[in-house]
Structure formats: structure tokens, C-alpha cells
């Protein structure tokens, strides 16, 4: 068989009327026929046709099934004899129809009449057949058909079964081409019919259907006079009442349900209705929003708390004796609550500044026996005394407990030591000129006056001696308490007052200095003023046998306050350093007389050495003094003219205008 002829037959369009031989034997197809078959075939060309799709692709199968249903066809899921067309995408489907039907009992006549009785006559006739086939025997024809079926259509396949049942076989390309042609024809037909309907509508009168009805009273209806817009309406359950007393943003037709919302949405500003021509807005005094709540005592809700508390029901509950037992127990408890920090008054921090330096002159006298008891008794003897290992006692026993190696001194500026400074003195030295915040535990007693004169006595327990200094006229008086300097701290003692005795009185008078030198001087005082520095000196020292004469001569010129030493010892190191301290005392007494004849050093260096220490755990406990037999002048070194103005300016500043920030 020629393959070109097979392609021509496969591309031929489907015939309009498909007739089956066994139509009478198919009762299911009779139900599909109807009287209006011609009308439906016009818009549904596949009406009454049943298709079976043998396609592996689901997407293509669904699309083709949709197109078939639009054209009036029906798709079955199972292959049977009732199927009209078998659609497949296999190659055998293109030429399977040209082979004719394979009869179960083939005969010589069937092969001859196969093409003539076929419902699909070929366009080119039976040109591919020859007259020799008529002369073929029955065996040859059977063998030829068996070879053809074996080569092109496999046995026992769906395609062979469809051929044996007489089902028309179509390729997918053929059915697609047929559907496209029918869609184009239907679209053209619909356009022509739609144009005819439009022409008929334009020719006829324009009648518009309207939905009419009756509104139930009461209602509101708004209509357009020109009738260009449709009316809108609103049916109400009851006729609203107009309220003229509502404020401006609210509608006069508001229902009572919105009254609560209306109160919450009151405006803050409104125009005065009484006739302010400028229309200035007046701010309304809105009432405070009442907070609703629930009373657990009365077991009821309330709108306002104050009104509920004043109600009779709540007052009866509050005045009842149900909780009298609890009140009695609470009244027996001890009130030991700590005051809250917010309630306690805040204490202002006192700031200290170095003001004008009080100029004093000192003369130290030695007495063999104490005559008076000390007048200053600190209130913190217990705290400081226990921590330092010494109790400050205002009697002779306290004076006897003092070591002869301990040194004492005066300070003209009021100085206090904080608790942090006392506790942490083993880590950092205490400075007299940079006082910290006063400790509330350190309270000093008031210095009483003696014989109506501003005279004060200083009693120090050093070698059972007593030292007295009196205030000088015209000089501000102040006393500072100084801690004693232990021998454990290796301070440069010889450099504190470096041999001032070598200076002659003549040199001192040229520079305006007067030196007061005592035989057993342990206290150093400097008398300064803003104009000049004056120191009154007596070169012949007082003998130990005449202490009262020296005392009476200098009592009028020596200012002083009552000074009580603060003693603090390191208890942990007291025993460990007992022997080294004794050796240091011996070396100290030997070292001081050896350097009596040295010349004075720089005044700045001597002042810096005053606050310098050589150990990390040492503490500043007072100005130093010397032994009885030293005979050294304990007056500070002479100020040089070029350095005196700059150095003294730090001490002559007013405490109200400036603050001391440090050296």
C-alpha cells in the first residue's frame, strides 16, 4: 500500500453525517436522537457523537474533552461497541482506517467488497488496488492480512479491538483540525445572529422594565426633579423627633441609643451661641471621666466611686465589727518600719573650699605635770578608739598611754575626715586640704570660753606634757583635728623643717619674718596675712624650769583652738611591726640631731614633703614634731619673693566665690 494515499485519507475532513451499519443493534444511540436534530446540528455539530480518548497527556486530554463538549459531543471513559470515534495519538491511527475491518470469518467476497461498502470512500477511488486481487485464493488473502496486522497493528491491543468492533479511528491531529474549523464557523454564525437582534431592538420602542413597590410608613425619600437620577429612600421603624438642643457635630435625628456615645464625643471647642461676632471658640470645661468599677464588699457595680463610698450600704459594711479581731492584732504589733527614702528629707552636701589662710604663731612649752583636763571630748570615742586600738580619755591616764615617739601638729584650716577616709587610710593617705563629705558619726563638741576671752587650751599626752597656744588678735580662728603620725609610716621627717635655726635673725627681719623658737617645740604655726607674713621670734629658748614665764609672755599673741588627736592604729600590723618600729625610733632620734646644721631647702619641696608618704598602706595622722632634745626650729621655711605670691594665692581665695580643686 502506498503511504501517500494513507496520508491523504487521514487528512480528509470528517463527514457531516456519520452512519453506522449496526445502528439498529445499538439501543443507547436511539435515546440521543431528537426532532430538533437539524437545529442543534447547526450550533452543535458533534451532537449525539460519543468519543473515547486514548491520550497519555492529561493536559491535552482535558483540553480536547472541553472542546468536544462545547460542540455537543460526549466523552466515555471505557471502550465499548457504543463508541462512535476512537481518538489516539499513535502512528497506527493514521492508516488504520484504510485497512478496513477485519472480519472474524473472512471470505473472498469480503475482501473484494471491503472498499465499496465502506462508509468512508476514498477520494481517489480504489486506485491502489489491482485486479489481480480478485484472482487470489483464500489462503493467500488470509496470509496477506495476517502479515499486515502483524506489521502495523499489534494483536490484542485497544486499537485492534476498536477495529474489530467497527469503531471509527481518528488521529489527534485530525480531530484538532476539525474542531478549529467548526469553532470559526460557529463564531461567524453567532456574529451574524447578534447583528440581526441588535437591528430589531433599535427598530422597536425602548421599553425598560422597572421594579415597582410601595414603601412602608414612616420613610424618607429623596427624588430628583429632572428625573436624571433614581430616588433613594430610607424606611424607619418610627418617625424620628428633631432635637434642637444637641451640640453642633451631632445630628438632630440621633436616636436615644447613641446618647452614651454622644456624651463621650463632646467637642472641646464650640462657637458661643450668645453672639460673639468674631466667632472666637470657647473651650468647654469637660467633666472628669468617671471610672466605673465593682465593689467586692457590697458585691455590686458602681458608676462613681465617691458616691458609692458614701452610700448607706457601703457605710454599714465599713462600720461593722466584722474585722475587729484583725484590728486588735494589728494594734499589738510593734511599729518598726523603715522610712521610705522619698519621705525622708534629703541632706545637702557641704562643699569645702580653702579660704584665707589663718595666720598664727605658736610657742610650745613643756610641763612636767598636767594641770588641766582636756576640754574637747569627741563623741565618737567608741567607734574610732576601738578601731585604732586607743581610747581617747580626758584624763591623765590617756596622756600616759601615749608613746614619746608620736608626733602632733596644728592646722589653721578646719578639716574633717570622712568615714571612708578613716577606713581606707591603709590604701591612700588623707589630705587635710581636700576634705571630703563630713561623716555623720564624727561630731565635735563646742569649745567653751575661759574667763570671757577667746582662749583655748590644747592638752596633749606626750611625755606627760601640756602645750598651750592663745589666739592672736585680728586673725580668723579655726582649729582642725589631726590624726597622729605613727612611726610605721616612713615620712621624711628631716625635710619637714630643714634646719631653720641656721638662719640668723637679721636675715629674717630683712624679709619681714619673726621666728618664735621654743626649747621643746613640738607645734608649728605660721602667722600670715594678705599683706605680709609676720612671725615674732625669741632667740633665747625658755628653760624647762621657767615654763610659766614663757607661757604668760606668749599667751596674748598665740591663737589656737582646742585640738584632740584622732588615733588610729593598724591592729593587724601592730604586733608584727612592734620590733621594727622600736628600731626606727632609735634611728630617728639619732638622725634628727645629726642634721640640725643643714641649710634650708626649697620651700615648695618642704611643703610637698609635708603630704608625701613612702608606703602604700601608710596614713596621714598629723603634722610632725621632734623630740625634747632636738632644739630644731619648727617653723616653715622662708618663702621666696618670686614664689610667695603664687603659692599663697591658693590659700587666700574666698570660700564663697571659689572652690578648691587641688594642687
UniProtKB/Swiss-Prot annotation:
Superkingdom of the organism of origin: Eukaryota
Species, as recorded: Mus musculus (Mouse)
Quaternary structure annotation from Swiss-Prot or TrEMBL: Forms a complex with CDC7. Note that CDC7 forms distinct complex either with DBF4A or DBF4B. Such complexes are stable upon replication stress. Interacts with MEN1, MCM2, ORC2, ORC4 and ORC6. Interacts (via IBM motifs) with PSIP1 (via IBD domain); phosphorylation increases its affinity for PSIP1.
The protein, known as: Protein DBF4 homolog A
Job of this protein: Regulatory subunit for CDC7 which activates its kinase activity thereby playing a central role DNA in replication and cell proliferation. Required for progression of S phase. The complex CDC7-DBF4A selectively phosphorylates MCM2 subunit at 'Ser-40' and 'Ser-53' and then is involved in regulating the initiation of DNA replication during cell cycle.
GO molecular function, a single term: protein serine/threonine kinase activity
Residues where Phosphoserine is found: 311, 353, 358, 412, 614, 656, 658
BRCT domain: residues covered: 40-128, 154-179
Amino acid at each position: 500500500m502506498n503511504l501517500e494515499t494513507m496520508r491523504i485519507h487521514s487528512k480528509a475532513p470528517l463527514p457531516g453525517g456519520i452512519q453506522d451499519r449496526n445502528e439498529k443493534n445499538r439501543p443507547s444511540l436511539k435515546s440521543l436522537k431528537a426532532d430538533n436534530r437539524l437545529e442543534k446540528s447547526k450550533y452543535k455539530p458533534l451532537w449525539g457523537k460519543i468519543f473515547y480518548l486514548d491520550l497519555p497527556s492529561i493536559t491535552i486530554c482535558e483540553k480536547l474533552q472541553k472542546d468536544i463538549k462545547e460542540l455537543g459531543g460526549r466523552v466515555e471513559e471505557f471502550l465499548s461497541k457504543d463508541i462512535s470515534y476512537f481518538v489516539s495519538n499513535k502512528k497506527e491511527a493514521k492508516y488504520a482506517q484504510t485497512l478496513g475491518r477485519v472480519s472474524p470469518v473472512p471470505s473472498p467476497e469480503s475482501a473484494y467488497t471491503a472498499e465499496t461498502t465502506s462508509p468512508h470512500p476514498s477520494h481517489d477511488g480504489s486506485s491502489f488496488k489491482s485486479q489481480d486481487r480478485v484472482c487470489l485464493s483464500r489462503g493467500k488473502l488470509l496470509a496477506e492480512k495476517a502479515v499486515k496486522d502483524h506489521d502495523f497493528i499489534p494483536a490484542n491491543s485497544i486499537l485492534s479491538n476498536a477495529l474489530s468492533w467497527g469503531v471509527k479511528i481518528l488521529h489527534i491531529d485530525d480531530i484538532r483540525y476539525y474542531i478549529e474549523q467548526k469553532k470559526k464557523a460557529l463564531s461567524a454564525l453567532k456574529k451574524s445572529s447578534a447583528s440581526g437582534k441588535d437591528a430589531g431592538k433599535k427598530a422597536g420602542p425602548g421599553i425598560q422594565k422597572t421594579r415597582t413597590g410601595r414603601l412602608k410608613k414612616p420613610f424618607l425619600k429623596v427624588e430628583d426633579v429632572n428625573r436624571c437620577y433614581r430616588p433613594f429612600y430610607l424606611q424607619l421603624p418610627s418617625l424620628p423627633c428633631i432635637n434642637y438642643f444637641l451640640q453642633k457635630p451631632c445630628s438632630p435625628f440621633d436616636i436615644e441609643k447613641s446618647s452614651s456615645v454622644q456624651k463621650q464625643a463632646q467637642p472641646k471647642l464650640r462657637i458661643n451661641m450668645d453672639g460673639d461676632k468674631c466667632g472666637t471658640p470657647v473651650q468647654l470645661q469637660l467633666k472628669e471621666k468617671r471610672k466605673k468599677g465593682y465593689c467586692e464588699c457590697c458585691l455590686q457595680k458602681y458608676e462613681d466611686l465617691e458616691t458609692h463610698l458614701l452610700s448607706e450600704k457601703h457605710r454599714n459594711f465599713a462600720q461593722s465589727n466584722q474585722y475587729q479581731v484583725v484590728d486588735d492584732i494589728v494594734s499589738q504589733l510593734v511599729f518598726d518600719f523603715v522610712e521610705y527614702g522619698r519621705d525622708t528629707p534629703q541632706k545637702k552636701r557641704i562643699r569645702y573650699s580653702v579660704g584665707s589662710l589663718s595666720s598664727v604663731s605658736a610657742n610650745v612649752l613643756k610641763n612636767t605635770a598636767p594641770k588641766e583636763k582636756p576640754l574637747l571630748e569627741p563623741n565618737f570615742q567608741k567607734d574610732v578608739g576601738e578601731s585604732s586600738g586607743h581610747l581617747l580619755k580626758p584624763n591623765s591616764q590617756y596622756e600616759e598611754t601615749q608613746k614619746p615617739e608620736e608626733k602632733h601638729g596644728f592646722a589653721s584650716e578646719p578639716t574633717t575626715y570622712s568615714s571612708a577616709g578613716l577606713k581606707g587610710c591603709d590604701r591612700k593617705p588623707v589630705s587635710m586640704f581636700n576634705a571630703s563629705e563630713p561623716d555623720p558619726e564624727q561630731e565635735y563638741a563646742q569649745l567653751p570660753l575661759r574667763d570671757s576671752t577667746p582662749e583655748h587650751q590644747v592638752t596633749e599626752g606626750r611625755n606627760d606634757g601640756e602645750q598651750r597656744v592663745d589666739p592672736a588678735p585680728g586673725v580668723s580662728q579655726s582649729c582642725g583635728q589631726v590624726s597622729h603620725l605613727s612611726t610605721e609610716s616612713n615620712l621624711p621627717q628631716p625635710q619637714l623643717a630643714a634646719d631653720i635655726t641656721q638662719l640668723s635673725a637679721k636675715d629674717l627681719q630683712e624679709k619681714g619674718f619673726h621666728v618664735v623658737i621654743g626649747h621643746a617645740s613640738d607645734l608649728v604655726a605660721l602667722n600670715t596675712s594678705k599683706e605680709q607674713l609676720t612671725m615674732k621670734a625669741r632667740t633665747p629658748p625658755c628653760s624647762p624650769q621657767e615654763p610659766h614665764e614663757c607661757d604668760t609672755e606668749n599667751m596674748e599673741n598665740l591663737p589656737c583652738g582646742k585640738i584632740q588627736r584622732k588615733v588610729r592604729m593598724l591592729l593587724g600590723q601592730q604586733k608584727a611591726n612592734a620590733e621594727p618600729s622600736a628600731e626606727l625610733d632609735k634611728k630617728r632620734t639619732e638622725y634628727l640631731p645629726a642634721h640640725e646644721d643643714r641649710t634650708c631647702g626649697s620651700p615648695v619641696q618642704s611643703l610637698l614633703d609635708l603630704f608625701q608618704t613612702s608606703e602604700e598602706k601608710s596614713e596621714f595622722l598629723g603634722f610632725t614634731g621632734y623630740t625634747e632634745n632636738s632644739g630644731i626650729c619648727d617653723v616653715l621655711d622662708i618663702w621666696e619673693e618670686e614664689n610667695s605670691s603664687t603659692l599663697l594665692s591658693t590659700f587666700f581665695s574666698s570660700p564663697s566665690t571659689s572652690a578648691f580643686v587641688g594642687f
